Amino acid sequence: MSGKDEYYNKSKQQGYRARSAYKLKQIDEEANLFERGDTVVDLGAAPGGWLQVAAEEVGESGTVVGVDLQRIDDLDDHDVETIRGDMTEERTRHYLREAIGERGADVVISDMAPNMTGEYALDHARSVHLARQAFDVAEELLAPGGDFVVKVFQGEDLDAFREDVRAEFEYLRTVSPPASRDSSSEVYLVAKGLNTAPVAAGDRIEVTVEERGDEGDGIAYVEGYSIFVSDADVGETVTVEVVDAKPRFGFATRVDVGTPDSDESDEGE
């Protein structure tokens, strides 16, 4: 039995609207995308197979919203909201923002593919274009630390797109789920931990230490973002170098303190 028949038949038996549901299941198994209570946005969601999987994984306490130019039939067994519209239009994005709330989405997923022409270079270019559109929407909708999954066809423009995504997230991997057809050039970029920090590693900034952390480090804030500063006391204003910037907090070391050599030299005089 071919891979296509296997997953097609399985989807019919288990009540999924599309065989692609198993791709998302396999990606989730590998990358741990979903948690109970998550808010998920599915871009290009018709016919709804990925919506079904997402709704199962986030449970009744979660929120799942799908958007597509095509109408998506109601999902009787799942509490899913669907929006018919173009995700690149501000009107549709407004509806999406209203649906997910001010906190934003925990996960944005996209299984979109262009209408195939049979001309590989053209199909690849269109695929990357769709993926970039999904990336733009994901950056707008995701909460800090959120995750992004997008399908794209392999080709000459993939590496540049992959690096653009990598620059905005803590971690990126490329996944080829077993449910993909052997003849397909599709891969999925799985990006974890959207980094919206107002600082980056290597930045030198002046901060005021406002609190002390559990491990003894000072804590300063930049636009509400927490930076742990070693060897600094509460109330000190110090110049620091950021050594690591994670989505919700970062680490920095002081660069305004004297060196041991200079201290010894002063004592010698």
Curated annotation (Swiss-Prot):
InterPro entries: NA-bd_OB-fold, RNA_methyltr_RlmE, RNA_MeTrfase_FtsJ_dom, rRNA-MeTfrase_E, SAM-dependent_MTases_sf, TRAM_dom. One of its GO terms (molecular function) is rRNA (uridine-2'-O-)-methyltransferase activity. Specifically methylates the uridine in position 2552 of 23S rRNA at the 2'-O position of the ribose in the fully assembled 50S ribosomal subunit. HAMAP family: RNA_methyltr_E. The gene is rlmE. It catalyses: uridine(2552) in 23S rRNA + S-adenosyl-L-methionine = 2'-O-methyluridine(2552) in 23S rRNA + S-adenosyl-L-homocysteine + H(+). Belongs to the class I-like SAM-binding methyltransferase superfamily. RNA methyltransferase RlmE family. This is Ribosomal RNA large subunit methyltransferase E.
